[in-house]
């Protein structure tokens, strides 16, 4: 059995890592994306490594969306089919999100405000993170 940190503890871990250890938030974003990519590959590409996955990444303009965009880029760069659905549900867009969005667009990832298909191998939540602060409708 292992311990899983709750929302408050995860936020404190992130804060300590960034402020006290000096690790930039954008680097944490990349590490999170790499870890999720490895998990996706181990589960879905273990039998057929050449299989192209069809992936939907749903993002909002905060840091969770930045995490999703970083993952979208890694999936795209390994040859998977990636669609990003950007739901503009918050008024403030984080700098890290803007940075990741700019990269995604420059390399050719399709970013729209709607879901263009209903048949995906992978659907990624780049909205809620470690726990929503508001009601989910």
Language-model features, listed with the residues they occupy:
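Positively charged, low-complexity intrinsically disordered leader regions
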Residues: 1-52
């Amino acid at each position: 059995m292992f311990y899983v940190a709750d929302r408050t503890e995860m936020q404190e871990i992130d804060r300590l890592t960034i402020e006290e250890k000096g690790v930039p938030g954008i680097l944490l974003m990349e590490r999170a994306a790499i870890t999720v990519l490895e998990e996706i590959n181990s589960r879905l590409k273990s039998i057929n490594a050449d299989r192209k996955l069809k992936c939907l990444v749903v993002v909002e303009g905060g840091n969770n969306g930045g995490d999703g965009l970083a993952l979208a880029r890694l999936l795209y760069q390994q040859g998977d089919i990636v669609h990003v659905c950007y739901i503009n549900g918050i008024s403030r867009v984080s700098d890290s999100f803007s940075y990741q969005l700019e990269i995604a667009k420059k390399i050719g990832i399709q970013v729209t405000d709607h879901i263009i298909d209903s048949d995906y191998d992978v659907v990624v939540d780049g909205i809620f993170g470690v726990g929503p602060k508001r009601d989910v409708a």
